[in-house]
Regions:
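Auxiliary alpha/beta "docking" domains used to position bulky ligands
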Residues: 1-123
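Iron-sulfur cluster-binding cysteine motifs and their immediate structural context
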Residues: 129-152
Length: 152
């Protein structure tokens, strides 16, 4: 499992505040940050393929398949088990100091790998910031999303 940050390089806390405040204006349309750039599926698949080729150069030829929302995989659960982060109360994977502003990609392989100890963690505690800031109030409860409320 890998992640790729999608915040603009020039993003600051002021930029994030402006974006969030823009969501509070119902008469103003807003396009999600992740949809403003190149198609992340293509970008990540290309990067994962390069990574697979690099691995083959280092350790020998093995089979690989790059997946970015293109296979019936539970990506958040796999990422959590791999130690990338934890599932937040907003149902997304969260990373310490990065939040949820990243894409997930999977590199499947037939290469034998050592298993490691599960590093599942949850650092949300009593925090409900992501639920409180949801502009459409789409969360019925922690970890429970009413997807019908996601679109204005």
């Amino acid at each position: 499992m890998v992640s790729m940050n999608y915040l603009p390089k020039d993003s600051t806390s002021d930029w994030i505040v402006r974006e969030i405040n823009g969501l509070q204006t119902p008469e103003k349309a807003s396009v999600s940050v992740y949809a403003r750039g190149k198609d992340y599926h293509r970008v990540m698949r290309k990067r994962l393929s390069k990574l697979a080729k690099r691995i083959c150069l280092e350790v020998g030829s093995y089979g690989f398949r790059a997946c970015v929302d293109s296979a019936p995989l539970l990506e958040v659960e796999l990422a959590q088990k791999s130690g990338l982060g934890w599932r937040g109360k907003n149902t997304l994977l969260l990373k310490r100091n990065e939040g949820s502003f990243f894409f997930l990609g999977t590199l499947l392989t037939d290469m034998p790998l050592k298993t490691t100890q599960n590093t599942t963690m949850n650092l949300c505690g009593t925090c409900t910031s992501c639920l409180d800031k949801c502009p459409t109030k789409a969360f019925i409860a922690p970890y429970v999303l009413d997807a019908k409320k996601c679109i204005f």
